[in-house]
Swiss-Prot record:
Catalytic reaction(s) noted: phenol + NADH + O2 + H(+) = catechol + NAD(+) + H2O
MF annotations from Gene Ontology: 2 iron, 2 sulfur cluster binding; metal ion binding; phenol 2-monooxygenase activity
Protein name as annotated: Phenol 2-monooxygenase, reductase component DmpP
Pfam families: FAD_binding_6, Fer2, NAD_binding_1
Keyword Oxidoreductase: yes
Keywords: 2Fe-2S, Aromatic hydrocarbons catabolism, Electron transport, FAD, Flavoprotein, Iron, Iron-sulfur, Metal-binding, Monooxygenase, NAD, Oxidoreductase, Plasmid, Transport
Domain named 2Fe-2S ferredoxin-type: residues: 3-93
Oligomeric form and interacting partners: The multicomponent enzyme phenol hydroxylase is formed by DmpL (P1 component), DmpM (P2 component), DmpN (P3 component), DmpO (P4 component) and DmpP (P5 component).
Species name: Pseudomonas sp. (strain CF600)
Function of the protein: Part of a multicomponent enzyme which catalyzes the degradation of phenol and some of its methylated derivatives. DmpP probably transfers electrons from NADH, via FAD and the iron-sulfur center, to the oxygenase component of the complex. Required for growth on phenol and for in vitro phenol hydroxylase activity.
Names of required cofactors: FAD; [2Fe-2S] cluster
GO biological process: aerobic phenol-containing compound catabolic process
Gene: dmpP
Amino acid sequence: MSYNVTIEPTGEVIEVEDGQTILQAALRQGVWLPFACGHGTCATCKVQVVEGEVDIGEASPFALMDIERDERKVLACCAIPLSDLVIEADVDADPDFLGHPVEDYRGVVSALVDLSPTIKGLHIKLDRPMPFQAGQYVNLALPGIDGTRAFSLANPPSRNDEVELHVRLVEGGAATGFIHKQLKVGDAVELSGPYGQFFVRDSQAGDLIFIAGGSGLSSPQSMILDLLERGDTRRITLFQGARNRAELYNCELFEELAARHPNFSYVPALNQANDDPEWQGFKGFVHDAAKAHFDGRFGGQKAYLCGPPPMIDAAITTLMQGRLFERDIFMERFYTAADGAGESSRSALFKRI
């Protein structure tokens, strides 16, 4: 049994299979509704039911309050149709978004690389190429691990038959612990994707700033490789933050790219390097490196941020003080079920991010 869901104001119609959520069906049919967490805690995918009956699912009471339930609002990531539906969604069409449909893939681990003491590079050969846009992510399923985990793609879209993921070891994390300690080359895994709307806005003028911290380097790496492969002539500057030299990974890749491409600059920053006499680069936090590099003036540029929430919030503050605005700054924040829907899970400065 399946039901048709009409999405207003665009008028698009999707077919939702029995037991499938509205969001799952939409993404797999190339219809991109706003979403973030995917499990009912952040409220990004809230929509209005205009006609029809729906099971609201396991939506958090913080993300979907009682009064909103009475008003027939639902979270698309949890809601399962019980009849044909008409819903109203805040669909913000972006001319630069390619909207590749989400599909399921099988893969085999082709390489495991120690990028740093806490970050491992996971390479997976897929059963077929996966079209995606640089900056997007996949949901990875692992043997014996409940649920899926989201990891950004580090490879460029031109190499879409083998994906590269950067996995930071999280203390107590079942999935990251499994990847770091048990997963082996040749093991079979499954994944779905692509997900996410973190991508370079090619139609928008302005030079590009990338600020990355930790394993958050993955998306900027994919974006920068894609831009340079396509011959983009805008000035591109990557600021990569880490605690120390051991945690600063793939620096040789970006140094080599900077040597070959005059429009690309690479600025690494270490925030625990005061006792490292051999470190000749920037000493301090990565947002301060960006401020120093541009003398605190960022006007006319577009910024893409990826990393731990404290780094992102500090970078947003620095960029806005340097005359960038909400429309100039892009990021994607991953949520876990433990994050809840509190204000701390979003930027205190922007409504959009």
